[in-house]
Amino acid sequence: MTHPDQKPWILGLTGGIGSGKSAAAQCFIDLGIDTVDADHAARWVVEPGRPALEQIATHFGNGVLQASGALDRGALRKLIFENPEQRRWLEALLHPLINQEIVSHLAKAKSPYAILVSPLLIESGQSRMVQRLLVIDVPQQVQIERTMLRDSSSQEQVEAILKVQIQREDRLRHADDVLVNDRDHAWLNSEVERLHHFYLTLRGGQS
């Protein structure tokens, strides 16, 4: 990890599906903190006209493209979900490109610290970009219930996703800070504000 005086100082924010990463990130944004979402970077690198999209279509066939030429994420997700080897191929293509996008956007941060939000922060090696790691955590049953409600998914579908994500215990082992997000939004907001002031202290009290 780099020294806290280095600019920009980056906080990594991660958590499993249904943990409330996006809600926590929004609380930081409301406090004026610049945030880069790895999921957004992942969408940018496969936009029409980008080289990665052409490589994906060549590898998987035009069945992964919509009529407009945009990526059909559902079709691609189905292909890689059923084939770990194909998923690894896709990750090897996209992860370096996604990381380049992330680094470029983080370098533009103007706030006292910046946040990288990523569901794959640990698995992808993106944790090497950050100085501190915050895990948003909830019990697994809460993850399942929230995701079923949000995505209209079955319990079996959510459990299948959980199986391919890093185990909760492993994620927590990497954490510098843990925010257990199993209460209401007002409580989440107060916890984020508490952590925000702590991170400002780590940055030497800049505001």
From Swiss-Prot:
Cited CDD domains: DPCK (cd02022)
Cellular component per GO, a single term: cytoplasm
One example of a Gene Ontology biological process annotation: coenzyme A biosynthetic process
InterPro entries the record matches: Depp_CoAkinase, P-loop_NTPase
Organism ancestry: Bacteria, Pseudomonadati, Pseudomonadota, Gammaproteobacteria, Pseudomonadales
Record's subcellular location: Cytoplasm
Assigned keywords, A-Z: ATP-binding, Coenzyme A biosynthesis, Cytoplasm, Kinase, Nucleotide-binding, Transferase
Known pathway: Cofactor biosynthesis; coenzyme A biosynthesis; CoA from (R)-pantothenate: step 5/5
Official protein name in the record: Dephospho-CoA kinase
Keyword Cell membrane appears in the UniProt entry: no
Positions of the DPCK domain: 10-207
EC number: 2.7.1.24
Enzyme class, first EC level, given as a word: transferase
PANTHER family: BIFUNCTIONAL COENZYME A SYNTHASE-RELATED (PTHR10695:SF46), DEPHOSPHO-COA KINASE-RELATED (PTHR10695)
Short name of one Pfam family: CoaE
GO molecular function: ATP binding; dephospho-CoA kinase activity
